[in-house]
Amino acid sequence: MDGTRTSLDIEEYSDTEVQKNQVLTLEEWQDKWVNGKTAFHQEQGHQLLKKHLDTFLKGKSGLRVFFPLCGKAVEMKWFADRGHSVVGVEISELGIREFFTEQNLSYSEEPITEIPGTKVFKSSSGNISLYCCSIFDLPRTNIGKFDMIWDRGALVAINPGDRKCYADTMLSLLGKKFQYLLCVLSYDPTKHPGPPFYVPHAEIERLFGKICNIRCLEKVDAFEERHKSWGIDCLFEKLYLLTEK
């Protein structure tokens, strides 16, 4: 392992305010799906999660797992296939339908009575439910508490000005002895406006530190050729485990 590229103590960028006023609307996110601008989707699933999954699950079954801003993440099926109950929220109906189609899962849809004009999509097996609505409306549905949250591509996509509201929503969904798995990206925010946005360690502490123990499990070089178009020359991904204090 190259200690200068994957160690957990790489210096973070000091200009953390440069992206604070960046805003993407829900309509702009929906347009990304319509126009196929979904390079954030990982067809093979997230490799850090795959690496640590069995350690996190510890042989348990029947856990409730929440996927914020789930898109069509294949990891949802990983958990469902291991006997867990998966709930996701995604603003794009297209993304949700693509998930069920690509995973060859039959499903039904029904209105979310608490949020007029929205739907929930449920697998025929009953262990995957995907809510098509804003994540900030989700608490109105009384979906209950979760044992685990897999947050990859969610906190980094939320408008920086909405992070406190987002974090409070996530914390309100956590049950006892929870595991909150969080992936964030580290790059020079003066070179790329986001999303995905740069989320430094201090921001995670600010958002979750009063309630959670915070541990960075791994930091890996995530730079790909496509990231050159962002104007950056390095990109790291960090996997955090947040647990109950």
UniProtKB/Swiss-Prot annotation:
<comment type="similarity">
    <text>Belongs to the class I-like SAM-binding methyltransferase superfamily. TPMT family.</text>
</comment>
<feature type="binding site">
    <location>
        <position position="40"/>
    </location>
    <ligand>
        <name>substrate</name>
    </ligand>
</feature>
<dbReference type="InterPro" id="IPR008854">
    <property type="entry name" value="TPMT"/>
</dbReference>
<feature type="binding site">
    <location>
        <position position="90"/>
    </location>
    <ligand>
        <name>S-adenosyl-L-methionine</name>
    </ligand>
</feature>
<feature type="binding site">
    <location>
        <begin position="134"/>
        <end position="135"/>
    </location>
    <ligand>
        <name>S-adenosyl-L-methionine</name>
    </ligand>
</feature>
<keyword id="KW-0007">Acetylation</keyword>
<comment type="subunit">
    <text>Monomer.</text>
</comment>
<protein>
    <recommendedName>
        <fullName>Thiopurine S-methyltransferase</fullName>
        <ecNumber>2.1.1.67</ecNumber>
    </recommendedName>
</protein>
<feature type="modified residue" description="Phosphoserine">
    <location>
        <position position="14"/>
    </location>
</feature>
<dbReference type="Pfam" id="PF05724">
    <property type="entry name" value="TPMT"/>
</dbReference>
<dbReference type="GO" id="GO:0005737">
    <property type="term" value="C:cytoplasm"/>
</dbReference>
<keyword id="KW-0489">Methyltransferase</keyword>
<keyword id="KW-0808">Transferase</keyword>
<dbReference type="GO" id="GO:0008119">
    <property type="term" value="F:thiopurine S-methyltransferase activity"/>
</dbReference>
<dbReference type="GO" id="GO:0006805">
    <property type="term" value="P:xenobiotic metabolic process"/>
</dbReference>
<dbReference type="InterPro" id="IPR025835">
    <property type="entry name" value="Thiopurine_S-MeTrfase"/>
</dbReference>
<dbReference type="GO" id="GO:0032259">
    <property type="term" value="P:methylation"/>
</dbReference>
<feature type="binding site">
    <location>
        <begin position="29"/>
        <end position="40"/>
    </location>
    <ligand>
        <name>S-adenosyl-L-methionine</name>
    </ligand>
</feature>
<feature type="binding site">
    <location>
        <position position="69"/>
    </location>
    <ligand>
        <name>S-adenosyl-L-methionine</name>
    </ligand>
</feature>
<keyword id="KW-0963">Cytoplasm</keyword>
<dbReference type="InterPro" id="IPR029063">
    <property type="entry name" value="SAM-dependent_MTases_sf"/>
</dbReference>
<dbReference type="GO" id="GO:1904047">
    <property type="term" value="F:S-adenosyl-L-methionine binding"/>
</dbReference>
<feature type="modified residue" description="N6-acetyllysine">
    <location>
        <position position="58"/>
    </location>
</feature>
<keyword id="KW-0949">S-adenosyl-L-methionine</keyword>
<feature type="binding site">
    <location>
        <position position="152"/>
    </location>
    <ligand>
        <name>S-adenosyl-L-methionine</name>
    </ligand>
</feature>
<keyword id="KW-0597">Phosphoprotein</keyword>
